[in-house]
C-alpha cells in the first residue's frame, strides 16, 4: 500500500528513486464508517481516522500490524533548498584522500533551487516488536528498537530506507535523501531530510521472505550472479604487474588450491593517473593476453575502478569538455544519462574489451567527509558532515542515491555491450533497487579484530533484511 501526503494542492505523481513504475492494482475496496474510512486489500485493512488522518494497519482478521500516532502523525516542514553555483567567488582546494586527490569546495555561491519538505512520520511500535534493516551500520546492533539510526552514506555505512518488522510487515521510504530512524524516550518516528512530499510503502507479509518479495515487487528482482562469483576470490593490496597476477594463478593451480577469481586492486593505471580507465602499459603490456591466460585456467579477473578521475587523465578531460562532472569536482555525474554512457564508453574501450570479467567499484558514495576527521566523529556529527559536504555537489533529495546510479552505469553498459557475461559489481555503496544491477556490497575499510567480526555479523544480517541479497 502506497501512502503519500503533501500540504500542496496536488501530488507530484513522481515514482521514487529505485522504485519501478507502478502497476494498477485491482481487488481493493473502500468502506466509509462514522469516524473512519477503511481500505481493504486481500491481506490488509487500513483504518484512516477522518479527523486526524492517522492510520492503523491491520491484517484482514483484525490483528494489528502497526499504528501511527493518534494526533499529528505526519509532519511536513517546508524549507528552501539551494544549489551550488560555480563562479569567480568559488574557493576550491585539492585534498589528498584514500581515494586519490579530490577537489573540495570550501566556499561557493548558492542560489535557490526549489521548495522541499523535512518529513516526519510518527509511529507506535508494539512492546515486543523487533525491527531490522535500514542498510548497514557499523555499531553491531541487530534489533534497532530503542536506538537512533542515521541513514547517510559513508565508508562504513550503507543507507537503505527499508525497515522490516518481526510483526510481519515492512516500510519502504520513497526518498533519495538522507533520513533518520528514532525510537527513544523522545519519540518514535521516521524522518527524511528533503522531499517534495511524504511518500512511503507499507508491505504486509506473513514471513520475512514475503516482505522481501514485496520489496522486490516494487524495486526489482535480484540479478543472478555467475556461478564463479559464489566461489573463492583472491585479493591482496596489491598485485602490481601482469606477470605477478599470472604467477599467482599458476601457483594456486599447481598446489591444487581452489581459485575462481583474482582481483587487481587500485593502480592499474599509469602513475599519477588516478581513476584513468586503462592499463599502465609498462606493467600490463598485454592485458588481453593476461585475461586469456587466466580464463584458460578457469580463473576470472576483477578490476577496481573509481567514479573520480585525476585532472591529469584523458578520461577527466573528456568529461570536463562535455560538462558531465559534478560541480567543481573530478567525479562524474552518474545522475546524467549522457555521463553514464560516457563513463561506460571509457570502461569499454580501456578495460572491458581486454577481457575483464567483474568490477570493484570503489568510493561509490562518493563523498566520505569522515576521512578528513582526525578523531572519529559521533553518528550525529557524521550525518551532519555528509549532509553539508555532499549537499555542495548533489541535490538534497538525491543525496543518498549516487551509488545506485553508478551501479546502473556498469550494469546497463555491460549488458548492452555483451550478454555473454553476467554483471558482477563489488561496490562499497548502493541503494533501494540496487539488487537488480548485479551488486555485491562490502562493508568498507573495517579493522581486523574479533570485535569487528562480531559487529559485522549484525551488520550483514540487517543489510540482507534491507532487500539486497549480496
Where are these regions (language model features)?
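Beta-strand-rich binding/interaction modules
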Residues: 2-18
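Catalytic and substrate-binding clefts that recognize carbohydrates or anionic sugar/phosphate headgroups
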Residues: 5, 20-22, 26-226, 236-238, ...
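Aromatic- and carboxylate-enriched substrate-binding clefts and catalytic-loop regions
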Residues: 15-20, 60, 67-69, 258-470
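Short, solvent-exposed beta-strand edge segments and adjacent coil->beta transition regions
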Residues: 195-199, 229-231, 274, 329
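Acidic/glycine-enriched edge-of-secondary-structure segments
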Residues: 197-205, 234, 395, 441-446
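Short alpha-helical scaffolding segments that buttress acidic/His motifs in well-ordered protein cores
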Residues: 215, 232, 457-460
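N-terminal small/glycine-rich loop or linker at the start of catalytic domains
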Residues: 218-235, 322-331
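Short amphipathic alpha-helical segments
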Residues: 241-244, 402
Amino acid at each position: 500500500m502506497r501512502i503519500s501526503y503533501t500540504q500542496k494542492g496536488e501530488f507530484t505523481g513522481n515514482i521514487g528513486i529505485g522504485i519501478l513504475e507502478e502497476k494498477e492494482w485491482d481487488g481493493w475496496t473502500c468502506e466509509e464508517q462514522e469516524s473512519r474510512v477503511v481500505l481493504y486489500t486481500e491481506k490488509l485493512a487500513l483504518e484512516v481516522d477522518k479527523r486526524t488522518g492517522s492510520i492503523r494497519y491491520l491484517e484482514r482478521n483484525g490483528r494489528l500490524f502497526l499504528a501511527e500516532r493518534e494526533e499529528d502523525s505526519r509532519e511536513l516542514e517546508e524549507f528552501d533548498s539551494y544549489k551550488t553555483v560555480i563562479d569567480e567567488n568559488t574557493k576550491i582546494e585539492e585534498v589528498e584522500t584514500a581515494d586519490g586527490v579530490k577537489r573540495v569546495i570550501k566556499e561557493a555561491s548558492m542560489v535557490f533551487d526549489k521548495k522541499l519538505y523535512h518529513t516526519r512520520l510518527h509511529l507506535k511500535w508494539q512492546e515486543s516488536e523487533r525491527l531490522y534493516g535500514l542498510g548497514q551500520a557499523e555499531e553491531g546492533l541487530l534489533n534497532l528498537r530503542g536506538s537512533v539510526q542515521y541513514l547517510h552514506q559513508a565508508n562504513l555505512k550503507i543507507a537503505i530506507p527499508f525497515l522490516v518488522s518481526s510483526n510481519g510487515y515492512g516500510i519502504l521510504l520513497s526518498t533519495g535523501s538522507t533520513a533518520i530512524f528514532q525510537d527513544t524516550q523522545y519519540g518514535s518516528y521516521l524522518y527524511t531530510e528533503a522531499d517534495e512530499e511524504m511518500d512511503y510503502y507499507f508491505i504486509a507479509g506473513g514471513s520475512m521472505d514475503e516482505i522481501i518479495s514485496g520489496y522486490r515487487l516494487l524495486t526489482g528482482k535480484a540479478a543472478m550472479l555467475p556461478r564463479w562469483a559464489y566461489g573463492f576470490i583472491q585479493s591482496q593490496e596489491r598485485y602490481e604487474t601482469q606477470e605477478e597476477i599470472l604467477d599467482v594463478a599458476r601457483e594456486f593451480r599447481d598446489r591444487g588450491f581452489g581459485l575462481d577469481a583474482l582481483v587487481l586492486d587500485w593502480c592499474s593505471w599509469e602513475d599519477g593517473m588516478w581513476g584513468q580507465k586503462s592499463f599502465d602499459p609498462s606493467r600490463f603490456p598485454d592485458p588481453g593476453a593476461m585475461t586469456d591466460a587466466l580464463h584458460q585456467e578457469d580463473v576470472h579477473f576483477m578490476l577496481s575502478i573509481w567514479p573520480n578521475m585525476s585532472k591529469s587523465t584523458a578520461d577527466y578531460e573528456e568529461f570536463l569538455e562535455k560538462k558531465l562532472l559534478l560541480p567543481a569536482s573530478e567525479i562524474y555525474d552518474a545522475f546524467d544519462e549522457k555521463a553514464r554512457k560516457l563513463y561506460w564508453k571509457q570502461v569499454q574501450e580501456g578495460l572491458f574489451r581486454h577481457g575483464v570479467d567483474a568490477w570493484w567499484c570503489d568510493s561509490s558514495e562518493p563523498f566520505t567527509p569522515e576521512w578528513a576527521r582526525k578523531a572519529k566523529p559521533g553518528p550525529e556529527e557524521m550525518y551532519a558532515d555528509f549532509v553539508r559536504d555532499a549537499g555542495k555537489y548533489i541535490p538534497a533529495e538525491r543525496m543518498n542515491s549516487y551509488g545506485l546510479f553508478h551501479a546502473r552505469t556498469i550494469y546497463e553498459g555491460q549488458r548492452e555491450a555483451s550478454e555473454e557475461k553476467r554483471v558482477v559489481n563489488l561496490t562499497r555503496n548502493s541503494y533501494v533497487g540496487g539488487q537488480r544491477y548485479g551488486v555485491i556490497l562490502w562493508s568498507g575499510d573495517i579493522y581486523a579484530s574479533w570485535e569487528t567480526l562480531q559487529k559485522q555479523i549484525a551488520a550483514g544480517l540487517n543489510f540482507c533484511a534491507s532487500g539486497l541479497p549480496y
